[in-house]
Amino acid sequence: MSFVELHCISNYSFLKGASHPEELVRQAIAQGYEGLAITDECSVAGAVKAWRELRRLRQEAPEASAFKLIIGSEFHYEGNCFVVLAPHKKAYGELCRFITDCRRKADKGDYQFSPDALNENIKQGLLLWRPKQSDQEFIPALTKIFSGRLWLLLELSLSEEDDSERELIQTLSSAYNLPVVSSNGVKMHAPERKRLHDALTAIRFNQSVDSIKDRLAPNAENYLRPLNEIHEIYPSFTIQESLRIAAKCAFELNEIRYQYPKEVVPEGDDPSAYLRRLTYEGAHLRYPQGIPENVLATLEKELNIISELQYEYYFLTIFDIVDYAKKSQILCQGRGSAANSVVCYCLGITAVDPTRASLLFERFISKGRDEPPDIDVDFENARREEVIQYLYRRYGRERCAIAATVITYRPKSAIRDLGKALGVDLLQLESVIANYGWRYRGQDWIDEVITPQVSQDNHILTCFKELLPELLGFPRHLSQHVGGFVLSAGPLVELVPIENAAMEDRTVIQWDKDDLESLGLMKVDVLALGMLTALKKCTTYISEITGKTFSLESIPKEEDSQVYDMLQRADTVGLFQVESRAQMNMLPRLRPEKYYDLVVQVAIVRPGPIHGDMVHPYLRRRHNLEDPDDVPLPELKPILKRTFGVPIFQEQVIAIAIVGAGFTSEEAEELRRSMASWKRRGHMGKLMDKLIINLLKKGVPLEYIQRLCRQIEGFGEYGFPESHAASFALLAYHSGWLKYYYPSAFCCALLNSQPMGFYAPWQVIQDAQRHGVIVLPVDINNSYWEHRLEPHSDNTKEGALRLGFRLVKGLSEEAACSIIQHRTDEGFTSLVQVMHLPKINREDLEALASANALASLGENRYQQRWECSGFLYYYQLFSECEYINIDFEPPSRLDNIYEDHSSTGVVLNDHPLAYLREANLTPQCLTAVELLKQKAGLKTYVAGVVINRQRPKTSTGVTFVTLEDETGSINILVWKKTAIAQMDILVKARLLMVYGELDKDEEGRVAHVLAHRLTDLTPHLEELESRSRDFH
């Protein structure tokens, strides 16, 4: 018995298919099918996943070697279903272009289709048609144009509609002499998925399952049936027809041949020679004193490999993008594995000298890796769109699009959608979701969340618990990658369909980065980084202050001990990559003294080193408490020397696998890929087994191997390669240097680059004030839209930081621009002058009054707000009316705190804790400054506004909380036991009092409190809406 299923959708027909493409391929092979067509609706989004799984199975299972995967797509029109199959490469390109046309004519997530469009555009593809009725207008034209390429699709579901289905097919077959082929109309790989398919249908219609029963499939027959059942249900000639159609289909995705864009090479130039010329021109700029011999040797080695692998166009494409950005004064920097390349450094793509950081080019490109290199480039987030639109202009929308990101169901979204489908009380469900400690969930979290509190119906609870694991990880829709662009020499629409993104002027292909990598398509990552915006603004301000051009290159190359001293104190609010509570906790322990220490610092607070229990051994060896030369095998010393014998980076783990466990370069590459995708797929079993067995044979202690394996799994969660950390460490140092030497300019740049980082503007300003920055309030006569530096007698170097109108909540930028445009050198002298300005309304005026931005016009903010609320408007209109003057009492100190915070989010020169302390509402509580003067071990109380909460994925389950009082920041460590016991207070309190034990670093410069008991003081500040930065 033989059969090929020609109509099958996966879960990439979003909310319609109930099985992953991989499940469908595995099941079809297990059932003994000769082939399977993946025909998602107006899409080929699931095709590469199916192809990749088949490729894997062909290597492992002999029965999969002859299995045929056919690529196609289905389209629906007025009850008809049309399935287009691609018999060869030309037909596949035609199908991709047709899908693109259908998608581009509709909003995101939808498509426009008609039989006429099908007739006009599909000249090579094969067409299967499941008709709605026999007298439709389009039928004569369809049968004529698709003569010899058209089949009627017979799909029987063992329901009462089967008889009418047979009759319709027979009528049309006789009338137009059309062959008939059988199909199961597959929507799931096994009948057990019927309940999930019903739930997905309900989610799609935004209804409960019970309310749409008439729209649900009558049974579970739309699955990959066993062959014997297929032969019992369908006439044999319709089954044989499936084999004949499959025989016509020879196309496989590996036939796709990608070509790099060619216009980056001047006409008549050889790409290899052109790349060499640009590289050496850049090398002379990078090394003005002469190119060192080791750099010359590395350059030649890299250029030869690039030429041998024919990657010149790739490097030149990236160079072209970076060159455009630099000419447009857009700050950018390459990172990731590209930082291993001296060629990238000389071309100006990356900023880290690989010879300085001892990075390995083979991590970036090697002959053993059958894939193009991956270069990530960060651009100022405020100006990245300019770079994106440049790419569209240069290559056109047919040859340029953004890669997709598959948005999948995570716990909260799955619970919400499934709960709605099952008809549970949504308000109650939201309450459960909001109050559950997600960061502390264990393996039994489903049982902890889905309780009788969600529903009293035991049947619903059982369904909920059984369906939830199936829904988790299911694709929900396609979104755009954060910056991955695909460029091609020819029409990209003939390689993969392109559709509209949600964002205007953006287009997205239907494949994600894993799909692109599998097929060897070039992806250029055009990423946005807020810190680059801040750094660019900061250097611009310094240029204005000094009267001399200043850039990041102006920062001295020599290591600055004062900057590292600041880092060791964890004085890092606003600094790139080292401002989180977890990083602040690590800095005084690691105590970085030079650039490479900062590389380790950036990388060590990640799941890889943490899960592998490598952090404490590293710190002990770094501070000479353990022997740094003690490694399990002598041959591992060169690999681990720079990190004191402890593996910290992904590259080191891979090197250990090669040198210590005898991995081939191909196996090492597979290990690298597995680490990157383990969290999503979990395919690392065989590699781990080999690693363990071979290291044991070499005499490596089992405990060390187990830690290494945990570290590998940790990298699957999130871990930094050394090259990535090296690029980020450079930006961390740059931001630290600027903060230390130009704190006012740095603070101004951070505020003008919001939102970014861990801290809200208020916290950034409070920190700046502690560093001597003079901060002046928003003022109608002195402020601009952006925050600015203005001359001040108390700071002749940088001046004072004047807060800008952008901080005022409710004030439109248009109104602010009108104020600035019409403001004279003398400034405004009365409220009436401001009222009469164009493009400013009552809401704008009230916002300014609330923010006390009208203080220079006299009177208090309450009086001004009353006058702005409309009374003066009416008085101006009806001047004969008597003006009634109402005097408002000035706001109290606490009122001003409330008003400042609610209107701008910033309280200058005061703090809620100072008020509460003076009101004796926080007795026994030490201030941040007092805390530093105490001895470790002291049991004490502290209190503050909650600035942020962070719980990194550590083995200890610690939560870091930052409090702020009127004197500074207070670091709180909450262990898991305390966190679980007082979860509600921990996650909800905005003003927190903590009783605990004081802990300090060896030099007594950094203190934190180990929490024993938490008290919520928020009721004291009910009107103050201080928002913390939680769990980032």
From Swiss-Prot:
InterPro entries: DNA_pol3_alpha_NTPase_dom (IPR011708), DNA_pol3_finger (IPR040982), DnaE2 (IPR023073), DnaE2/DnaE/PolC (IPR004805), DNAPol_HHH (IPR029460), NA-bd_OB-fold (IPR012340), NA-bd_OB_tRNA (IPR004365), PHP_dom (IPR004013). The gene is dnaE2. Belongs to the DNA polymerase type-C family. DnaE2 subfamily. This is Error-prone DNA polymerase. DNA polymerase involved in damage-induced mutagenesis and translesion synthesis (TLS). It is not the major replicative DNA polymerase. It catalyses: DNA(n) + a 2'-deoxyribonucleoside 5'-triphosphate = DNA(n+1) + diphosphate. Its EC number is 2.7.7.7. GO terms for cellular component: cytoplasm. Signal peptide: none annotated. Pfam families: DNA_pol3_alpha (PF07733), DNA_pol3_finger (PF17657), HHH_6 (PF14579), PHP (PF02811), tRNA_anti-codon (PF01336). GO terms for biological process: DNA repair; DNA replication. It is found in: Cytoplasm. Its main location: cytoplasm. Keywords: Cytoplasm, DNA damage, DNA repair, DNA replication, DNA-directed DNA polymerase, Nucleotidyltransferase, Transferase. One of its GO terms (molecular function) is DNA-directed DNA polymerase activity. It is an enzyme of class 2 (transferase).
